[in-house]
Structures are given as structure tokens and as C-alpha cells.
Amino acid sequence: MGDTNGQVVAGGNGYGSRLDRPTDVLIDKETDSLIICDWNNRRVVRWSRRSDTTQGEILINNIKCSRLAMDDQRYLYISDIEKHEVKRYQIGDKNGTLVAGGNGQGASLNQLNFPTYIFVDQQQTIYVSDRDNHRVMKWNKGAKEGIVVAG
């Protein structure tokens, strides 16, 4: 059956290692790599699963990343808890496109307050758990404000 010992595949064993408070991870099947929200280092990194990689490639810097998702076209969606927004990135793009929030911290339909978990469907509709507003928001592709779907 299963192995009783885990294996470190990214970062190290404790505080001060290469990753500092990773908050989310997904697998990019096309590149066979892990994409990680490295929260306390304020970045998103990619680690190959194919080799004994000793450090990750920085995809996006200067972001207080909480969670991430990837759609069918391999766009990366990242919730930024400091800017209270969600952006969509093409791999290699450093700036991204605003897709939810982005109007400062608040409770209006065009604002978020500590966006955490995100889900993107096949129509690129984004669902955001808007933690400190105690709601889940739906943002249709191209929308300037969201719709409360729960809370």
C-alpha cells in the first residue's frame, strides 16, 4: 500500500526555506510542473516535476497571492489579498488583466474584501470566495461588477 514518509518536492523543511507560507498549488499538465502561491515571498513560482529541481522559476513577483486556478486555455487566475482583486495571466505575462475586484477593499459589487478561493468554469466565469464580506461572488467574463451567488 502507501508510503508512510512524504517527499519534499518544492521548498524545504521549515521557516527560512525557499518557499515561505505557500497557500495554494496546482499542476500544469502541459509542462508537468507545480505552480505555487508563495505567499510570504510575494510571488508565484513554477517547479518542474520532471527533475530534481532545487529552485523554482518566478512567474509573477510582488503579489500577495492567496489562491490560484487555471482554465482550459491555460490562463492563470490569481487572487491578491492585498489589492483585493483577481487577475488573469497568460504564462509569461507579468502584469495580467483584472477580472474581479480592483476597486479597492470594500463591499460594493465591484469590490472584494480578502478574496481567497477561486474557481473558473469553461466560459471563463470566475467564482470568488470573498472572505471578509462573507459571500461568494460570480464575475462573468468582461464584467465590471460581480453578482452575489451565496452569502
What does each of the following model-derived ranges do?
Residues 27-31, 70-73, 120-123:
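Residue-level detector of Asp-centered blade-edge/turn motifs that repeat once per structural unit
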Residues 2-23, 50-64, 92-116, 142-151:
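Gly/Pro-rich loop segments of beta-rich domains
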Residues 22, 65-67, 73, 83, ...:
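Conserved positions at the start
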